[in-house]
Amino acid sequence: MDSKHQCVKLNDGHFMPVLGFGTYAPPEVPRSKALEVTKLAIEAGFRHIDSAHLYNNEEQVGLAIRSKIADGSVKREDIFYTSKLWSTFHRPELVRPALENSLKKAQLDYVDLYLIHSPMSLKPGEELSPTDENGKVIFDIVDLCTTWEAMEKCKDAGLAKSIGVSNFNRRQLEMILNKPGLKYKPVCNQVECHPYFNRSKLLDFCKSKDIVLVAYSALGSQRDKRWVDPNSPVLLEDPVLCALAKKHKRTPALIALRYQLQRGVVVLAKSYNEQRIRQNVQVFEFQLTAEDMKAIDGLDRNLHYFNSDSFASHPNYPYSDEY
């Protein structure tokens, strides 16, 4: 079944496919691989493609999309393409140039969705992660409401069809929602979300504000050594997920993805393996029972794989609050 028929309506009237393809890969993976796997994903039925300035793959991902348009597989309007504003570009005058740069790299006229990648502003400049002589990350202090106003201007200019945020907590979302003169609400909040960190309170809050929660690391992350504790439990080896996979004759990954869809969460499936990319679109072919869902709900242990210790002292560190 083609996943493009399964969409959620955003608060600005646009539609987002509920299954997305995540394109991030650790630096040791050759960039050319992003081109190859994004093409495979589109061939398999993915229509929602998630990238970012941080991923350093927008040229390859854009080329993959354009090549599938050129060969007649899809039209541009069939594809929902997301990019993200990196933390070194939060100052309002840097927002539009950053988006224009992303569009230039992807060679696309617009993005379907542009997100503030993180609430934690960093010192502007070429470095993705600017550090001082002691190796400490250099923060910047920016009023994110001014960043948001610059995002709104990008939507008005037609450079982004929709705008949203990522890695925001409730307080940070409320700051935007309560901003005097708010023109557009964020359509979504893209956060780490999986059975070990199910974000149920944040999900309920987002639903109450007509903001879609989008899950990244829905399969428990790629366990990139730079971010993830190698001793943390491996989500897809969880006995409950494995038992449900056996029961439904599916993979544990499909159980984890289906869980999110049934909670009303848009889910990103990241894989650089052809067989698993094809498997992941089977998420629409089966259903979990209420008991299955309850069993998966019970796995929550408030475990975030992305261990941002170097950012814990940032005034906008999102995990300082309960949710």
Swiss-Prot record:
Keyword Nucleotide-binding on entry = no
Q: What is the effect of changing R226Q?
A: Decrease in the retinaldehyde reductase activity. Exhibits changes in both KM and kcat values
**Highest taxon of the lineage:** Eukaryota
The keyword Cell membrane is annotated on this UniProt entry: no
For this protein, the Enzyme Commission number is 1.1.1.-, 1.1.1.210, 1.1.1.53, 1.1.1.62
Q: Which GO terms describe its cellular component?
A: cytoplasm; cytosol; extracellular exosome; nucleus
The pathway entry for this protein reads as:
Steroid metabolism
Known tissue expression: Expressed in many tissues including adrenal gland, brain, kidney, liver, lung, mammary gland, placenta, small intestine, colon, spleen, prostate and testis. High expression in prostate and mammary gland. In the prostate, higher levels in epithelial cells than in stromal cells. In the brain, expressed in medulla, spinal cord, frontotemporal lobes, thalamus, subthalamic nuclei and amygdala. Weaker expression in the hippocampus, substantia nigra and caudate.
The entry's keywords = Cytoplasm, Lipid metabolism, NAD, NADP, Oxidoreductase
Outcome after substituting K75E: No effect on 17beta-HSD activity
Pfam families membership:
Aldo_ket_red
- Kindly identify the residues recorded as the active site: Y55 (proton donor)
Locations listed in the record: Cytoplasm
Q: Which reaction does it catalyse?
A: a 3alpha-hydroxysteroid + NADP(+) = a 3-oxosteroid + NADPH + H(+); a 3alpha-hydroxysteroid + NAD(+) = a 3-oxosteroid + NADH + H(+); prostaglandin F2alpha + NADP(+) = prostaglandin D2 + NADPH + H(+); prostaglandin F2alpha + NADP(+) = prostaglandin H2 + NADPH + H(+)
Q: Which InterPro entries match?
A: AKR (IPR020471), AKR1C (IPR044482), Aldo/ket_reductase_CS (IPR018170), NADP_OxRdtase_dom (IPR023210), NADP_OxRdtase_dom_sf (IPR036812)
- How might one describe the regulation of this protein's activity? Strongly inhibited by nonsteroidal anti-inflammatory drugs (NSAID) including flufenamic acid and indomethacin. Also inhibited by the flavinoid, rutin, and by selective serotonin inhibitors (SSRIs). The oxidation reaction is inhibited by low micromolar concentrations of NADPH.
> GO molecular-function annotation terms?
15-hydroxyprostaglandin-D dehydrogenase (NADP+) activity; 5-alpha-androstane-3-beta,17-beta-diol dehydrogenase (NADP+) activity; aldo-keto reductase (NADPH) activity; aldose reductase (NADPH) activity; all-trans-retinol dehydrogenase (NAD+) activity; all-trans-retinol dehydrogenase (NADP+) activity; androstan-3-alpha,17-beta-diol dehydrogenase (NAD+) activity; androsterone dehydrogenase [NAD(P)+] activity
**Residues where substrate binds:** H117
Q: Which family does it belong to?
A: Belongs to the aldo/keto reductase family.
Q: What does this protein do?
A: Cytosolic aldo-keto reductase that catalyzes the NADH and NADPH-dependent reduction of ketosteroids to hydroxysteroids. Acts as a NAD(P)(H)-dependent 3-, 17- and 20-ketosteroid reductase on the steroid nucleus and side chain and regulates the metabolism of androgens, estrogens and progesterone. Displays the ability to catalyze both oxidation and reduction in vitro, but most probably acts as a reductase in vivo since the oxidase activity measured in vitro is inhibited by physiological concentration of NADPH.
Protein name stated in the entry: Aldo-keto reductase family 1 member C3
Its source organism is Homo sapiens
This chain is encoded by the gene named AKR1C3
